[in-house]
A protein has these predicted regions:
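N-terminal signal peptide
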Residues: 3, 13-36, 723, 745-751
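Extended glycan-interaction surfaces of carbohydrate-active proteins
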Residues: 50, 55-59, 63, 67-68, ...
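Active-site core of glycosidic bond-cleaving carbohydrate-active enzymes
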Residues: 209-221, 229, 391-417, 421-424, ...
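Alpha-helical solenoid scaffolds that mediate protein-protein interactions
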Residues: 242, 276, 300, 411, ...
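Aromatic/His-enriched, Gly/Pro-containing loop or helix-boundary segments
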Residues: 245-289
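Short amphipathic alpha-helical coiled-coil/interface segments
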Residues: 293-296, 423-441, 618-626
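Cleavable C-terminal sorting propeptides in eukaryotic secreted/cell-surface proteins
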Residues: 725-751
Length: 751
């Protein structure tokens, strides 16, 4: 029989391992003055069947991928067999394990198996015998210039908020890594071992959890925090690593593993260089950075840019899209992709061409950084089953084109008068991108940006937080500049969130799809982008206070007509607390704005006299983000001596956090600020680089406006979500696909 889905036991074992692996052992010396003791965790095999069971039959192997060299960590018989055996609950675990033998010996050992009779136990023994611990190629790094009390802390007036910022500042010492030169394998195929790691020459900060290597777009928000922490050498080192990758590969890959070499991530390298130079005044880096920035932009222009004709104006533009050349499962998510393609419940299996195209779409979805979201599905409400309708390559995304526009603007500024010709060229290209964004992606009636869908030759109608990318990057449509009312209308959904929900702004308002880039999840980078977009609005458009809904209406009625493409009743519900637990707030009308009433938690800070609407929303966003991070950290064992005692064991037991000292999560719930986010292909990760970076930026930027948050009691929180959901331990539903949905999707396959 064909392998079908992850077994519950494997998922539970993987969840337990993930929580244990999230706790990094360190010494107790002054942060940064000594190398922390890094505990390399080795996952315990948790196969989906008994060790004596024969492996399920396999689908035919996908084509070999020219961009991925090797037969162990790239698509092939060995990788597919280990994944079909489901040795680990997270497919990334295996591909992060260096071999303990030469490539030839590992392949020879594997060739001894008869794949029609091989058992789970034989594969487990093979992996245990021929592979070492995941992440062994990295070692903890000392941050020699670490300052325990950076100047930004003086901006924070609330004692608890200040102490928490200082605590988070100290986490950099636990996330700093170097390549462990003694554990590096020689270049394939020679040497005594093989590894998937791309060795880097300089210190870097990892996101945390399963993300053991340097990542591209994560590093932008990590750098925002490192700058506040005055760790400028670490910022420089991060940029040097990226420049090494551009020199070696012609682009910056998604992350520091060979299995990422067919795709990039949102191209924020030039943004990072600009911020570093702007803060430090170190222009010496530009001698190397400018030519390599040109090379990266050329890669995006040559590999990800197409001509698009506007149905609105008949003008033609060169616009970028995410489009990865790939015809096999992603090695780090092999089983997930394999099951998406080869589900036995399909009444009509995909053809080879359809499978190859969907593999390309799955990889392209990962390149967006939003892996995955209903934003890129042809049938958004289907959630995980809808991954079969992924239409990433046929969308012209708001985010990517906005970033590339600003990259050209920043590069022109970095050139200045030293190369007027290059500067002028980039400004000209930027003007073309800007015109395309305003024509194709901006809806002047709805006062929002939407991705342009090449399949329908029209804008999508799904409202996402990506709408704020253009203004963050300096593209402000004339309609926004026309009046305070219009400027507010662009941010009206943010106002709705701070009135209707307890947390921060979700990715979309499409909820419980099982996809991690949908509601109720809210992500640190998006909160940063929204706050920066608010800061970009000219002050003459922000003097009025927040508008008030008319009698009988709610803040939903302040949102421009059609902007959300959902009725008020279709928006996600906000669970109530206390005596009203186990029910949601009223869905429509004035009572839907629960933060003006009782039965909820308000964490918006304190208003000041004469505060305009822009500043009110910034204050609300800053405090809510701080509350989400601090409360979920406290709920998982975090404490601050003299200010915030650790929760009793009876409450920590609700979050499986006894013995833990607080987790910094990668994503949060906008419904429950005690909780991490939900869903996705892997369990929620702790660490966490970009969460820390955004929090330190918020502390530095809004420190005087921060107040100690009100965290809802965990007992109440546990009545509105499952125990696992309370800490974000909701297993991926990517492999749990119903026959009805799959049969429908096979019929409706649109790619």
């Amino acid at each position: 029989m064909m392998v079908s889905s992850l077994k519950a036991a494997a998922v539970v074992a993987g969840l337990i391992h993930t929580i244990l692996a999230a706790i990094i052992g360190t010494t107790t010396t002054t942060p940064g003055t000594a190398v922390p003791t890094l505990t390399i965790s080795t996952a315990v095999a948790s196969p989906s069947a008994s060790l004596g069971a024969t492996l399920p039959s396999q689908a035919p192997l996908p084509p070999s991928q020219g961009w991925c060299i090797g037969q162990i960590f790239c698509a092939g018989s060995l990788l597919q067999t280990v994944n079909v055996a489901q040795v680990y609950s997270d497919p990334k675990t295996f591909v992060d394990k260096p071999t303990s033998k030469s490539s030839q010996q590992v392949l020879a050992d594997f060739s001894n198996f008869n794949l029609s009779t091989v058992t789970e136990g034989q594969i487990v023994n093979f992996v245990d015998s021929d592979f070492l611990g995941e992440g062994l190629e990295l070692e903890a790094a000392a941050l020699t210039n670490f300052n325990p009390t950076p100047a930004f802390l003086n901006n924070v007036t609330d004692p608890l908020s200040k102490a928490f910022a200082q605590t988070v500042h100290g986490y950099w010492t636990q996330l700093a890594r170097n390549t462990n030169q003694s554990a590096i394998c020689d270049e394939y195929p020679g040497g005594t071992c093989e590894s998937s790691l791309i060795p880097l020459n300089h210190t870097f900060i990892i996101p945390g959890g399963r993300f053991r290597e340097q990542y591209y777009w994560d590093s932008y928000w990590i750098i925002q925090g490192l700058i506040q922490s005055e760790l400028y050498e670490t910022v420089n080192a991060t940029l040097q690593n990226f420049m090494d990758e551009i020199e070696g590969f012609g682009f910056i890959p998604n992350g520091g593993r060979i299995y990422y070499l067919n795709r990039s991530q949102p191209p924020l390298f030039i943004h990072m260089v600009y911020d570093y130079v702007n803060v430090t005044g170190d222009t010496s880096i530009l001698q190397r950075a400018l030519p390599l920035a040109e090379a990266e932009l050329a890669w995006w222009a040559n590999n990800r840019t197409i001509e698009v004709a506007s149905p609105y104006t008949n003008q033609t533009y060169m616009m970028a899209h995410y489009a990865v050349n790939n015809t096999a499962p992603r090695p780090e998510s092999y089983l997930t992709d394999y099951l998406t393609i080869h589900d036995p419940t399909l009444s009509t299996p995909l053809t080879d061409n359809q499978a190859a195209e969907l593999y390309s779409e799955l990889a392209s979805g990962a390149e967006t950084g939003w892996d995955y979201s209903s934003r890129f599905e042809a049938i958004p409400q289907l959630g995980n089953p809808g991954l079969r309708s992924l239409n990433v390559k046929n969308n012209i995304p708001i985010c990517l084109n906005s970033i590339l526009y600003k990259a050209r603007i920043l590069l022109a500024e970095l050139y200045g008068t030293s190369n007027a010709t290059a500067s002028s060229t980039h400004l000209q290209v930027a003007a073309g991108i800007r015109a395309g964004i305003l024509d194709l992606l901006w809806d002047p009636a709805k006062l929002a940006f939407y991705d342009f869908n090449l399949t329908s030759n029209a804008r999508n109608d799904i409202f996402t937080a990506a709408t704020f990318y253009p203004v963050w990057n300096g593209i402000i449509p004339n309609e926004i500049l026309a009046s305070q009312s219009n400027a507010f209308g662009y941010f009206a959904a943010v106002n709705l969130v701070v009135n209707k929900y307890n947390g921060t702004v979700p990715v979309t308002f499409i909820d419980w799809t099982g996809l991690q880039w949908d509601a109720p999840n809210s992500w640190p980078p998006l909160q940063y982008i929204i706050m920066q977009a608010l800061r970009t609005i000219p002050s003459n458009l922000t003097t009025n206070g927040l508008p008030t809904p008319s009698s009988g209406q709610s803040t939903y009625d302040l949102v421009p007509a059609g902007q959300l493409a959902l009725t008020e009743a279709q928006l996600p519900g906000q669970p109530l607390l206390g005596a009203q637990a186990n029910q949601n707030a009223t869905a429509t009308g004035p009572a839907a704005d629960i933060n003006k009433l009782s039965g909820t938690v308000v964490n918006g800070g304190n208003a000041t006299a004469g505060e305009g609407w822009r500043d009110t929303l910034q204050r609300e966003m800053a405090n809510r983000y701080y509350a989400s991070v601090l409360c979920s950290w406290h709920a998982t064992g975090g404490s601050i001596p003299g200010l915030l005692p650790q929760l009793p064991a009876s409450e920590l037991n609700l979050t499986n956090s006894i013995g833990n000292t607080g987790n910094m999560f990668e994503k949060f719930s906008n419904l429950n600020i005690d909780s991490s986010g939900y869903g996705g292909e892997y369990t929620v990760q702790a660490g966490f680089g970009w969460t820390n970076g955004v929090l330190l930026w918020v502390a530095s930027t809004y420190g005087e406006q921060l107040v100690a948050p009100q965290c809802p009691p965990l007992v109440a929180a546990s009545t509105t979500t499952s125990t696992s959901a309370a800490v974000g331990l909701q297993a991926s539903s990517g492999a749990v696909i119903t026959a009805v949905m799959m049969a429908f999707m096979a019929h409706a396959f649109l790619l």
